[in-house]
């Protein structure tokens, strides 16, 4: 089983990078994970709605170019479905048991995620109604994946 994480922008803080490396090592016995970064558009101050939509579109097109056909796509979005860690592990298990060999998790940039990606995803998933920095979401996702595979949540 293979998991892709497609994320907008590069990690800038060492503590986040260190955490990502930590969880990638812990996940290695359970699955293959590849993180694909796409370029983040620079957003000017006092962005108009039209400018925001254009930035989301450009980032979104880059994301779409990285999604492999046949992969089960999960977009992380604040308005998505909320589930707990146990249900997340059951969801991962059920997805792979249903015949999918790959899952792709998509994390948008600082402005969020292009609406077209959310519409094309199999699932829009929310980890919380709170807003988290998009770079930190990679670490949070990896931690939840580790919990799912580690057996504490019965995967």
Curated annotation (Swiss-Prot):
Known EC number: 2.1.1.177
One Gene Ontology cellular component: cytoplasm
Compartment(s): Cytoplasm
Pfam families: SPOUT_MTase
Reaction(s) catalysed (UniProt annotation): pseudouridine(1915) in 23S rRNA + S-adenosyl-L-methionine = N(3)-methylpseudouridine(1915) in 23S rRNA + S-adenosyl-L-homocysteine + H(+)
Enzyme class: transferase
Single GO MF descriptor: rRNA (pseudouridine-N3-)-methyltransferase activity
Disulfide partners: none
Record keywords: Cytoplasm, Methyltransferase, rRNA processing, S-adenosyl-L-methionine, Transferase
Binding-site positions, S-adenosyl-L-methionine: 76, 108, 127-132
Function: Specifically methylates the pseudouridine at position 1915 (m3Psi1915) in 23S rRNA.
Subunit structure: Homodimer.
Family of the protein in this entry: Belongs to the RNA methyltransferase RlmH family.
NCBIfam families assigned to the protein according to its UniProt record, in alphabetical order: PRK00103.1-3 (NF000985)
Protein name as catalogued: Ribosomal RNA large subunit methyltransferase H 1
Species for this entry: Thermoanaerobacter pseudethanolicus (strain ATCC 33223 / 39E) (Clostridium thermohydrosulfuricum)
Organism classification: Bacteria, Bacillati, Bacillota, Clostridia, Thermoanaerobacterales
């Amino acid at each position: 089983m293979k998991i892709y994480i497609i994320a907008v922008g590069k990690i800038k803080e060492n503590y986040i990078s260190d955490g990502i490396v930590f969880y990638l090592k812990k996940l290695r016995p359970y699955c293959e994970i590849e993180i694909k970064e796409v370029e983040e558009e620079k957003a000017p101050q006092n962005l108009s709605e039209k400018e925001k939509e254009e930035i989301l579109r450009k980032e979104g097109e880059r994301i779409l170019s990285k999604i492999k056909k046949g992969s089960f796509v999960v977009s992380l979005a604040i308005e998505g479905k909320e589930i707990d860690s146990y249900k997340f592990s059951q969801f991962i298990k059920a997805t792979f048991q249903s015949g999918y060999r790959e899952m792709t998790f998509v994390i948008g940039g600082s402005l969020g995620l292009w609406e077209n990606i959310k519409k094309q995803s199999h699932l829009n998933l929310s980890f919380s109604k709170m807003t988290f920095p998009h770079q930190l979401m990679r670490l949070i996702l990896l931690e939840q994946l580790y919990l799912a595979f580690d057996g504490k949540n019965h995967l």
